[in-house]
Regions:
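Fe-S-dependent hydro-lyases/dehydratases of central metabolism
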Residues: 1-191
Length: 191
């Protein structure tokens, strides 16, 4: 937790040299998680109770800084499938969308409540519903359910729910049209 977590913290610069993103999931928050001798520091990603979690709860201005694409790649390859926070750097938010990761927003108070529930009851299962723009969970003690409203720009929500976030897949699915357009463009004809 904390405000203004930049992409250099999410994925240290030395891991940008990897030729592919395949191993990127080993390194999110690496310098926050490990000492220079390789021993573990106290960090939520190192805690057994959070292993396998796929929703990341963050505070304000998450993903600021250089906005490197490697940051959401590292989180996705760690297993994060959605991020819920107060606010994001716009480029980071867009990079998340391009990988199919919803980066949704909610109030500071709601984030605080969600983090508190997670901290005291790490077994709590959260459900993110982009159609209803909610995140819900049940209280483990009594089975009571709580629903929290989220915000996501409508074009992002539609892209994620309709599967149009993946521009590469869309290009391949429309390859005939791509080729027709390429033939009309003299500057790329023959490539």
């Amino acid at each position: 937790p904390g405000n203004s977590i930049d992409t250099d913290v999410i994925i240290p610069a030395r891991y940008l040299k990897l030729v592919t993103f395949d191993r990127m999931g080993e390194f999110p928050f690496y310098d926050e998680r490990f000492n220079s001798d390789g021993t573990q520091k106290e960090h939520p990603f190192n805690e057994p109770r959070y292993q396998g979690a796929n929703i990341l709860f963050v505070n304000k201005d998450f993903g600021i800084g250089s906005s490197r694409e490697h940051a959401p790649q590292a989180l996705m390859r760690w297993g994060i499938k959605a991020i819920v926070g107060e606010s994001y750097a716009s480029i980071f938010e867009g990079n998340c969308l391009l990988m199919g990761i919803p980066a949704v927003k909610t109030s500071k108070e709601s984030i605080g409540s969600l983090m508190e529930i997670l901290n005291t009851n790490p077994e709590t299962e959260f459900t993110l519903d982009l159609d209803s723009k909610t995140i819900s969970y049940s209280y483990p003690q009594n089975g009571g359910k709580r629903v929290v409203g989220i915000d996501i720009p409508e074009p992002y929500r539609r892209a994620l729910t309709e599967g149009t976030w993946d521009s590469t897949r869309m290009l391949y699915a429309n390859m005939d049209k791509v080729r027709q357009t390429a033939e009309r463009l003299q500057q790329i004809r023959g490539f």
